[in-house]
Amino acid sequence: MKKRTFAVDIDGTITENGGGRIHLDALESLRRLVNMGHDVIFVTGRSSVEGFLLSVFGGTTKVSVGENGGCITLDSNDHILLGNLEECKNALNILKNNMENVEEKYVFPRMTEVVLQRTFDLDQARKILSENNIDVVLSDSQYAYHINSPGIDKGTGFTEIMKKFSISRDDVIAIGDSATDVPLFKVAKTSVALGNASDDVKSEATMTVSAHAGDGVLEALDKLAPILSEI
C-alpha cells in the first residue's frame, strides 16, 4: 500500500447541519484511513488548536493547519505562526471606520488572523482596504469572513507541512467545500469538492461528489478506493 496524506477541511466538510457538529460516520472513516497507515490532517479556518484537539479525540494524525493557513499546531504548546495578527487587526480597524455592520465573530482565540461575522459586503470591504493600501487577504469560508496576512492561505500553510514531513504533492488528497479550500486543492495532486461546494470551487477540483458535507466525504472515499489500493 502506498501511503497517502489527506488534507481535510472541517466546517462544511466533516460537519452536519451547519452548526459545527461532527458527522461521526465521516470521522470514523477518516480514523480508519489512519489505522490503514495513511495520514489525515485537518486544514481549517478554525483555530489550529481546535483542529489539533479534533485530531486527538477523533483519532487522526496529530497535526493541524488552522486560521486558513496562518498557524500550524504540532502539539499542545508547539505552534508555527505564518501570519501576522497585528496587520490583520489594522485592517479590521480600517473596515470598522469605513463600513457598517463589521463585527468580529466570537471564536476560539486566534494567533494570526481576525474572524468576522458574514454581515457586510465582501467586495466593498476589499475595495476599501485597497484604497487604503492595506495588503491583506479577505476571504469567505462560509463559516465566517477571515482577514489573513498577504500570501497566507490553506495552500501555503499545508505546503509548510509537506516540507516539514517530506510529503510529495503526488501523495496528497485534499477534501473541501469552500473558496478557502481552493488554494489547498492547488497543492494536492487529487482534490475533491463536495456537493455543497459552489460551481466555482467544483471547477478547481480534480473530482466532485454529489453528496453534501460528511455524506460527501463518505462518497469521496468510496470513489478514491481504487487509488488507495495502489501499491
Swiss-Prot record:
InterPro entries: HAD-like_sf, HAD-SF_hydro_IIB, HAD_sf, PGPase. It comes from the Archaea. Keywords: Carbohydrate metabolism, Hydrolase, Magnesium, Metal-binding. The active site is at residue 9. Pfam families: Hydrolase_3. Substrate binds at residue 154. Signal peptide: none annotated. It catalyses: 2-phosphoglycolate + H2O = glycolate + phosphate. Its EC number is 3.1.3.18. Its cofactor is Mg(2+). GO terms for cellular component: cytosol. GO terms for molecular function: magnesium ion binding; phosphatase activity; phosphoglycolate phosphatase activity. Mg(2+) binds at residues 9, 11, 177, 181. It is an enzyme of class 3 (hydrolase). Catalyzes the dephosphorylation of 2-phosphoglycolate. HAMAP family: GPH_hydrolase_arch (MF_01419). PANTHER family: HAD SUPERFAMILY HYDROLASE-LIKE, TYPE 3 (PTHR10000:SF8), PHOSPHOSERINE PHOSPHATASE (PTHR10000). Belongs to the archaeal SPP-like hydrolase family. This is Phosphoglycolate phosphatase. It comes from Nitrosopumilus maritimus (strain SCM1). The lineage of its organism: Archaea, Nitrososphaerota, Nitrososphaeria, Nitrosopumilales, Nitrosopumilaceae.
